[in-house]
Amino acid sequence: MAIDKTTLAILACPKCKGKLTYYADKDELVCRGERLAYPIDENIPVLIADKARELSSEELEKVPS
């Protein structure tokens, strides 16, 4: 599922309120500042910090800017 640009522009990381990037390869929303990836479940972003997974430096490098 792709997130449209308008929706992505209004979403923010619940932890730091920073910008999120859509990572199509994993179908996740990524916060670079917190190094967290939020899942998308049945086309709904799950923006709950406890549900996010931490990204390694290697994974973070693969996420498009």
From Swiss-Prot:
Pfam families in the record, alphabetically?
Trm112p
Gene Ontology CC: cytosol
InterPro entries linked to this entry: Trm112-like (IPR005651)
| Family recorded in the similarity comment | Belongs to the UPF0434 family.
State the PANTHER family in the record: PROTEIN PREY, MITOCHONDRIAL, ZGC:162634
What protein does this entry describe? UPF0434 protein IL1511
Give the taxonomic lineage as stored in the record: Bacteria, Pseudomonadati, Pseudomonadota, Gammaproteobacteria, Alteromonadales
